[in-house]
């Protein structure tokens, strides 16, 4: 297989007149937060004060490419082919981001409150951290080497799941 390092690139964005320079950014997370979401959180750590609010993330700092097998074979292999890192070089959050972010605030989602409502546990904890710089409760990071299971595999659905149960397994 050919080395693809020649395809690496860096793009620097220029500030725009309407740009904001946030002091703190809170990301609402669950144990199903993975992949591109974790990449964004990890990337922002190099540039801003960041917190995850909710629970520890899944831990997937890698990406995949698809490889089709021979023309007569319908199979496709999806292989882990790259690892992501932020501008500071942080990359090994295989057990979730709680151990690698400076602030990891534990909070529960309040499904009865509208998204963004200060009565919602996640929103409330995020606003507290943004306003004070402190977490009322801290997420305990995963034990190193502990296997994680997919969120969907842990939460069975009822026979006739509501929209909330379908989109947020484990909420029943």
Regions found by a protein language model. Name each.
Residues 1-172:
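C-terminal "post-core" interaction segments
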């Amino acid at each position: 297989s050919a080395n693809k390092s020649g395809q690496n690139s860096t793009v620097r964005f220029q500030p725009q007149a309407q740009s904001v320079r946030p002091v703190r950014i809170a990301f609402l997370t669950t144990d199903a937060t993975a992949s591109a979401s974790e990449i964004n959180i990890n990337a922002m750590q190099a540039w801003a004060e960041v917190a995850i609010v909710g629970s520890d993330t899944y831990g997937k700092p890698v990406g995949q490419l698809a490889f089709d097998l021979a023309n007569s074979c319908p199979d496709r292999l999806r292989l882990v082919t790259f690892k992501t890192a932020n501008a500071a070089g942080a990359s090994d959050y295989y057990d979730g981001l709680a151990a690698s972010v400076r602030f990891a605030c534990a909070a529960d989602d309040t499904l009865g409150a509208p998204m963004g409502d200060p009565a919602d546990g996640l929103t409330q904890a995020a606003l507290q951290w943004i306003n004070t710089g402190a977490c009322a409760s801290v997420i305990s990071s995963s034990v190193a080497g502990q296997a994680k299971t997919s969120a969907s595999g842990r939460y069975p659905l009822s026979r006739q799941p509501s929209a909330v149960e379908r989109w947020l397994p484990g909420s029943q």
